[in-house]
A protein has these predicted regions:
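Conserved phosphate/ATP/ADP-binding segment of small-molecule kinases
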Residues: 1-91
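Short Gly/Pro-enriched loop/turn and capping motifs at secondary-structure junctions
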Residues: 73, 100, 135
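Phosphate-handling active-site elements
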Residues: 91-92, 117-131
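Short pre-catalytic strand/loop immediately N-terminal to key active-site residues, enriched for Gly-Thr
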Residues: 91-104
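Short, small-residue alpha-helix embedded
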Residues: 101-124
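Charged C-terminal helix
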Residues: 125-173
Length: 173
């Protein structure tokens, strides 16, 4: 509904970090989502996504990092999925292999890893990279085990990688 969207816009302007997918980012920034289908190459499409993230960042009430998650570029020879962070330091693009199946909960898991990394002192850019790697390994493991997409992904055995990465970050600072 329009009231819900207005409320989400107001709430998202107050956050330090937001992680919308591209459709959500377009809705929050009043960007025409139909324009996303106008692009014939990955670079132009990714530029559209980063411009949308920058527009959202500019709408924030204060400093904000915007991470558009799960941007799928299937027009490339090898399809990839991207996460695009726009911060005060600029645009950071992280890509990973695009699997041919979607799994429940991966967006929530990405946001949780990002949040945990940020709380532990990582930059948003480093957190985006680590969250992407974490999901890649977890999804690959899940695909090998033939798990139903509705059952989520096998991420538990990769939690130690997150713990080690955040411990290294803390040592470095």
């Amino acid at each position: 509904s329009e009231d819900l969207l207005a409320g989400m816009k107001e709430l998202s302007r107050k956050a330090d970090v937001i992680t919308p997918n591209l459709t959500e980012a377009c809705l929050l920034s009043d960007t025409d989502i139909a324009k996303a289908t106008d692009y014939t190459d990955a670079d132009s499409f990714l530029h559209f996504a980063s411009d949308t993230a920058a527009k959202l960042r500019d709408m924030a009430d204060g400093p904000q990092d915007v991470v558009i998650t799960g941007v799928k570029c299937q027009k490339e020879e090898t399809p990839f999925i991207y996460n695009i962070a726009v911060t005060e330091r600029g645009v950071h693009t992280s890509r990973s292999h695009l699997f041919n199946r979607s799994f429940s909960g991966t967006g929530d898991l990405f946001a949780s890893v990002l949040c945990g990394c940020r709380v532990n002192g990582m930059t948003t850019e480093a957190a985006v990279d680590l969250a992407g790697q974490f999901l890649y390994h977890s999804i690959a493991d899940t695909m090998n085990d033939n798990v139903s997409p509705n059952d989520g992904i096998n991420f538990e055995k990769y939690l130690i990688d997150l713990i080690n990465a955040t411990a290294l970050q803390k040592k470095a600072t």
